Each structure stands twice: as structure tokens, then as C-alpha cells.
């Protein structure tokens, strides 16, 4: 099982999005619970948590975002691409990821590190 979430569930968010933070934290917990409960059957459960990913979005929705401020927080000084997230999912779904379970894989250019 591969969930797509985000890191707000670990850090909170400042834009009155408690509902979003709660849902993401719940997703992280579900990922771990499924990994424990169903690992005995060979089922893996992980979450991929994207960060700043360049996608085709409605520009009006993100007009308040200061791109330079976002990029300054990244260890890798450019946004990721949708393919970066897809590659993480492919790794988890392939045989190469068969021993990875209960994890949150952060694809965020080093913005958030554990």
C-alpha cells in the first residue's frame, strides 16, 4: 500500500489548516498500523510525502506563495518534479522496496529532515 500525504502531519501548518494537518497525521499512523498488522502476510505499507513539487496548478490558487522563500528553505535549491514522487512510489512498489514498510518517504529537496 502506498499513500500520498505530506509533512504537515509532522510539523503543523500556519494557515488555519488544522483539518489538513489532522488528516495527514492520521495517514501516517494508518501507514504504520497497516504495516504492523499486515506485514505477516507480506503486505507493505508506506507513505510518500512530497514537498515543493512543480506542477500545473491554478495560478490564482497560489498567487500568495513567495517562490523565493520556498526555495530558500530547500537544501536542493529547486522544486521537485512530479516524476520525483512517481519514482519514489515505483521504488516502493518494486522488488527493491519489498523490505521497506511503515515508513514515510519524504520527497522534498531537504526542506524537512528527520
Language model regions located:
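Catalytic loop of short-chain dehydrogenase/reductase
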Residues: 2-26, 31-40
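Short C-terminal tail/terminal secondary-structure segment
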Residues: 11, 90, 101-114
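A glycine/serine/threonine-rich, flexible loop-to-helix segment
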Residues: 15-17, 40, 50-74, 84, ...
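Short alpha-helix in the Rossmann-fold core of NAD(P)-dependent oxidoreductases
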Residues: 23-24, 46, 77-78
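Short-chain dehydrogenase/reductase
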Residues: 31-32, 86-89, 93
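Short, small/polar-rich loop/turn modules that mediate ligand/substrate recognition or access, typified
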Residues: 39, 44, 100-102
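Conserved SDR Rossmann-fold cofactor-binding beta-strand/turn motif
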Residues: 44-54, 93, 106-108
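A conserved structural motif in NAD(P)-dependent oxidoreductases
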Residues: 74-85, 96
Amino acid at each position: 500500500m502506498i499513500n500520498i500525504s505530506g509533512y504537515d502531519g509532522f510539523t503543523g501548518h500556519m494557515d488555519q489548516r488544522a483539518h489538513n494537518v489532522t488528516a495527514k497525521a492520521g495517514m501516517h499512523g494508518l501507514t504504520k498500523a497497516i504495516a504492523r498488522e499486515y506485514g505477516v502476510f507480506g503486505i507493505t505499507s508506506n507513505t510518500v510525502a512530497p514537498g515543493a513539487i512543480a506542477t500545473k496548478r491554478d495560478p490564482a490558487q497560489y498567487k500568495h506563495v513567495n517562490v523565493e522563500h520556498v526555495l530558500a528553505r530547500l537544501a536542493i535549491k529547486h522544486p521537485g518534479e512530479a516524476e520525483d514522487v512517481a519514482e519514489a512510489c515505483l521504488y516502493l512498489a518494486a522488488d527493491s522496496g519489498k523490505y521497506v514498510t511503515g515508513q514515510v518517504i519524504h520527497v522534498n529537496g531537504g526542506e524537512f529532515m528527520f
